[in-house]
């Protein structure tokens, strides 16, 4: 089925190419120097999007995207992207690495702190080359506006979000200062955020072994915390060939409490045997978190040099109380956990022109240390005191060349040596792995008439997060527990991506084959408790995706829309004692459809209205099925004031239809789970933005050790 679909997509691309070549349209002329590289600039609508190799570059400055709000709100509107403002994704590729002026975005709160007005353009790379970590399936590179001017500038933003259904409020604010003189740029900011988030769910679990065991009932999850983020840095542009800089992000956690409430009935062979009401309260403390980056960027003759050094230090301690009221017996359970993480990373990229192209080579080294502890006052669950050590040393080389009218091509190879040690002093568990892996990449792009096309291939991997490898059993309730798995294998993914762009239309199709897929599975204990832990599937997963983006503009109205489908080919043979032979085959192959439509109406006197609609249909993702069509409708109005447009007022109703839901069903043979989630996203949002003498930071650090940093956060 997937093969026939893929052949059909390729045939459609061929027809599009032929049709476009027959059209007698005037070629698009532009003053941008990049046109000289024979890239296709897509006009006829905003934002302007062009295909460059296997990357889509979207201009933000001077388009309706520039007034989207926060960086996160803008990214979900960029062609080739989807997701939410808190978790943007690249279509068909998942969460990307995000760079801002070459610096890795290491703190997700920057998605809220940075404004879309500051952005010049966004580059979406849907199949990154050998320079990037082998775990990276997509990269988003953001460039801010290059404004001239010196002196002091101020940037003040204040936002309040009022939940329209449950009544709570979530304020945030940022004060940023920038001072520029000559080639020196000094910047700093303070950001405050109050988190108040609710999730309301209905949970059903059925275990069908020698007896039928069933649990059902509502549960509520609440997260509340306050944090301050301090940012400071300096950039020195020595001359046109040399620049250096350093940046530090300090996060002060002001305390937080999470609460999970279960209220469920328990049945055995259709007879109620218990009613459990459980309150789990978690109080978190975190010392000051440190994220730093230092860089040098320059040239020595024809040799380009890009060097980065990163350091990360985080710690979190959690104390939990479980109060359980039951028909069988009441209980009070105490537990606690702690995590300390340290990371040192460095990356060096050298570039040199060779023949008609550019040769890039370099190295990246990451050294990660993590210490996990867990204790509980129940003798049936073991305590944990584990050390995790992971060292990754990589070298890479990539060469790209331009064949003129015959197109551009690049090939690359990345070698990674990974050393992993896991040791638990409480139970003598020890695991040692030493891996040597090669990851090839290749890309080819050519313009066929008025159509720009690109084809790319890469071999990728996905390493489990440090949380997923933690063997400690976390107590949720007497019927539910959770654990990691230090025996997990890395995923191996072959990725083939085809792109085509014509005027304001862009089509992307991709095929992926993944082995050792990591997912969650349930195991049943002798006392009928469910243990959820991570496993590797024993079958590969084939996935096909196709997306089309179109960005027309008519008068005051501009549209940025994306439609697509993603389908996986997966079946599993599941243990089920109630079928003949004790095994049954389950198919997980229902496609997921996506439709995003971002409408902008730009009126006189600096008024602007936005109607943003996002739809994700029901369908399978790995061994889980979402049977709900998720919809989000956001209505936004904003007005700019003062002669220099320094003041902006913005009001929005988020999730106006209250359809941001998810109903997830998991089939694991003898164990089935249905979880229906309702999120607290129906809100009224009001934002005030004031800027004085706006300038932009010239910081050019790219960051290193990106994969390990992300896995520590997960």
Positions of predicted regions on the chain:
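Outer membrane beta-barrel strand-and-loop segments of large Gram-negative receptors
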Residues: 343-347, 394, 489, 506-596
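Outer-membrane beta-barrel signature, preferentially recognizing the C-terminal barrel domain
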Residues: 388, 430-435, 461-515, 530-545, ...
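Short acidic/polar hinge/loop motifs at secondary-structure boundaries
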Residues: 77, 103-129
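Extracytoplasmic beta-strand/coil segments of soluble accessory domains associated
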Residues: 49, 72-104
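Face-selective signature of the C-terminal outer-membrane beta-barrel domain
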Residues: 229-255, 279-424, 445-447, 452, ...
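Short, acidic, small-residue-rich periplasmic hinge/interaction motif at the N-terminus
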Residues: 22-64, 84-85, 93, 125-126
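Surface-exposed extracellular loop regions of Gram-negative outer-membrane beta-barrel proteins
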Residues: 144-160, 200-204, 216, 228-232, ...
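N-terminal periplasmic accessory domains that precede
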Residues: 28, 39, 71-74, 109, ...
